[in-house]
């Protein structure tokens, strides 16, 4: 609901929003050179907010074999599905990564009615804050599988399972 509210506010605001755009240069004269989907664009501004964002690691960037079936999402994709489209990403969920975002997403999946099979973490301990570990995993009885990784995706067209490997 917060995301939908922000989108609505931005649509009605007297501001210019540039998505998927790189700032090539900024000057003290309040001008910027941008490179975006429409190409090169010089702009002048009174105020400028740079929201640099980030890039998520996709499953394709990890050494995982198997097909690339539907049903594998980044945290950002899952959040968009839930927050903006009100779609549940699946009935059964496995979260890869125990940083704060992974912990919070695991809890959110439970609240959305998903069965969270666990949170998989390559390192030997949880990567998130202790309070998030307690409130997200322990309170919802979600298992944390440390020193573990996903090595294979199963399914033709749709994800049907994964192979996990313990790293010890």
List each model region and its residues.
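Short glycine-/acidic-enriched loop or helix-start segments at secondary-structure transitions
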Residues: 59-61, 104-106, 155-156
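Rossmann-like NAD(P)H-binding beta-loop-alpha module
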Residues: 77-125
